[in-house]
UniProtKB/Swiss-Prot annotation:
Keyword terms: Angiogenesis, Cell membrane, Chemotaxis, Disulfide bond, G-protein coupled receptor, Glycoprotein, Membrane, Receptor, Sulfation, Transducer, Transmembrane, Transmembrane helix
Disulfide bonds listed in the record: C122-C201
Subcellular location, principal: membrane
Organism: Bos taurus
Biological processes per GO annotation: angiogenesis; calcium-mediated signaling; cell chemotaxis; G protein-coupled receptor signaling pathway; immune response; inflammatory response; negative regulation of execution phase of apoptosis; positive regulation of angiogenesis
Lineage: Eukaryota, Metazoa, Chordata, Craniata, Vertebrata
Record gene name: CXCR3
Annotated protein name in UniProt: C-X-C chemokine receptor type 3
Superkingdom field: Eukaryota
Transmembrane intervals: 56-76, 89-109, 125-145, 168-188, 222-242, 255-275, 300-320
């Protein structure tokens, strides 16, 4: 997976005569994997839409995502000695989201003009994007599993085990994501299209490889994490519903928002990609109107997915009691001039409660 402008074969109406003289053409998404005997559809409208929409969207997500996840990382690192297992996963999640949005300015330039950064940076940027795309989804699954064990089974897997257990889990997640990104190091390259007189960062492999990569993206980057989150949070809700207290009600609202946000952000994109893949495989009829609609839908829905990187700080940190208390403590430590900072600094008893690892407080204190 790379941002949508890099997954589309650019084509102008002026090239139609050229294509009629050639019996084969790389039909599809900016990769050289599909050959057909009929010329592709003009993509002037979808390309113009991308040149306007994607740079603005990517720039906005870059600023918001870097700022929000940067704040989360700074606040968590300010009290490293007191980090719980969930806090550690949140820290890695913030790093993953920040690194993902860090590549968006490069893809914004690619969408607005062309790829001007060479094949080396093309491979690195594509791999970095995908590593952190997979890491974000898998770390969310780790957080849900950790909370499931803590609340449903009252088991502190990481707290009671060796201190390196959570670190090894994170290393395993990053290693798996690096493995998933190997196709980017191998097949991504900067390619110049003489007909368009433009260069773009694109994949270069057969259609079968492209389909396999999409299946990997769908299963490892969406379906499996979503199933883990849905199962774990459904069991958590079953426990919380039979309990009472305002704290647990807040926890119940939070776990519902977590799953809904992930599903709403990424489900539309994967549905559109599924339709596009079925069109590539011939299972769905391809026509110019449908192709243009799918191209635009991929751009819009992928933007919705990337927005999840900006939502994570809000859902997992700013909504959490423990994070807000840590943030005020950090502001006081840095010498916040506003008297309200001192007024909102938590008392010792409140800090002790929110840092506890009991079944009730450990989740609501996220």
């Amino acid at each position: 997976m790379v941002p949508e402008m890099s997954e589309r074969q650019e084509f102008q109406a002026s090239d139609f005569a050229y294509l009629l003289e050639n019996s084969s053409y790389d039909y599809g998404e900016n990769e050289t994997y599909f050959c057909c005997t009929s010329p592709p559809c003009p993509q002037d409208f979808s390309l113009n839409f991308d040149r306007t929409f994607l740079p603005v969207l990517y720039s906005l997500l870059f600023v918001l995502g870097l700022l929000g996840n940067g704040i989360v990382a700074v606040v968590l690192l300010s009290q490293r000695a007191a980090l719980s297992s969930t806090d550690t996963f949140l820290l890695h999640l913030a790093v993953a989201d920040a690194l993902l949005v860090l590549t968006l300015p490069l893809w914004a330039v690619d969408a607005a003009i062309q790829w001007v950064f060479g094949s080396g940076l093309c491979k690195v940027a594509g791999a970095l994007f995908n590593i952190n795309f997979y890491a974000g989804a898998l770390l969310l699954a780790c957080i849900s599993f950790d909370r499931y064990l803590s609340i449903v089974h009252a088991t502190q897997l990481y707290r009671r085990g060796p201190p390196t257990r959570v670190a090894l889990t994170c290393v395993a997640v990053w290693g798996l994501c690096l493995l998933f990104a190997l196709p980017d190091f191998i097949f991504l390259s900067s390619h110049h299209d003489n007909r368009l007189n433009a260069t773009h960062c694109q994949y270069n492999f057969p259609q079968e490889g492209h389909t396999a990569l999409r299946i990997l993206q769908l299963v490892a980057g969406f379906l499996l994490p979503l199933l883990v989150m849905a199962y774990c949070y459904a069991r958590i809700l079953a426990v919380l519903l039979v309990s009472r207290g305002q704290r647990r009600l807040r926890a119940m609202r939070l776990v519902v928002v977590v799953v809904v946000a992930f599903a709403l952000c990424w489900t539309p994109y994967h549905l559109v990609v599924l339709v596009d893949t079925l069109m590539d495989l011939g299972a769905l009829a391809r026509n110019c109107g449908r192709e243009s609609s799918v191209d635009i839908a991929k751009s819009v829905t992928s933007g919705m997915g990337y927005m999840h990187c900006c939502l994570n700080p809000l859902l997992y940190a700013f909504v959490g009691v423990k994070f807000r208390e840590r943030m005020w403590v950090l502001l006081v430590r840095l010498g916040c001039p506003d008297q309200r900072c001192h007024q909102r600094q938590p008392s010792a008893s409140r800090r002790e409660s929110s840092w506890s690892e009991t079944t009730e407080a450990s989740y609501s204190g996220l």
